[in-house]
Amino acid sequence: QTDTDSNSEGDETPAEEDVNLQTLEISFDRTCQFACSYCNPAFSTSWVKDIKNNGRYEQLTSDGRNHFTHIHESSQLYGYQEDNPYIEAFWKWWESDLHKTLQELRVTGGEPLMSADMWKLFDWFKDNHGKSNMRLAINSNLGGKDALIDKLIQKAQHVEHFHLYTSCEAIFDQAEYIRDGLVWSTWTKNVDRVCAEGNLEGFHMMCTVNALCLFSLTDFLDYCLELKSKYGKDFPTFTLNILRFPSFQSPLIL
């Protein structure tokens, strides 16, 4: 999205004219300790490890995108110790003027908290207080150990407009089955911690409505209402997104 999108009807921006972005979503890498059932190797190194160790999934005739048959090497063009020209270009742009012109930067993954560049970004806000008034938003599975959540809470104190997005749509064993790697008690503890201590301007729950969550989805929404009563009506906001792919996990198959 650019700052010309809000122009009055009939205004036209010449194709050769430079424009400033209003929002930007980036992913530094796909490192992630979860292998959620509706995710795939393009967004999770845990999925990559599974397919490397156990081989491709066979006879998934309804997976039209073939996500589970290969490791999506094109999603990680550079190794973790290699210089990445795309990330270098981002930092050059960020330092020059992007931090002044953006309204929101949203960092996804993988799991952003496992990326060194995410912590570099947090440190930039600490070292450059007042230089940017933008919203910083991250997607996190909030499955990290105490030390990682401690670090997140500490770094978040230096971001004036910090928004955190996390994902879940079921409770207890059902949630752990759908989102492989999640420990329900750890996740709920971390949710409480970031809501109480994390200097959040916004906390958002993304629910992926799929065939495996329907029997406890309403219980999960009750949990969200309990959070609202504890931390305020907007903690969390939540969205209900109908899963379409992989189609064998769509609620429409039931």
Residue map of PLM features:
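Distinct, well-ordered alpha-helical segments
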Residues: W119-D123, D146-K155, S216-T218
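A Trp-anchored, charged/polar loop motif used as the substrate-binding/catalytic surface
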Residues: N7-E17, E82-S96, D146
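Alpha-helical packing segments of well-folded alpha/beta enzyme cores
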Residues: L24, F90-W93, L121, W187-N190, ...
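Flexible, acidic/Gly-rich N-terminal and inter-domain linker regions that tether
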Residues: Q1-Q22, F34, Y38, A42-T45
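Core AdoMet radical
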Residues: L21-T31, A42-Y86, K100-A116, N128-L148, ...
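Short, acidic, metal-binding catalytic loop of nucleotide-sugar glycosyltransferases
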Residues: W124-G130, E197-G198
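Catalytic cores of alpha/beta
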Residues: A211-L227
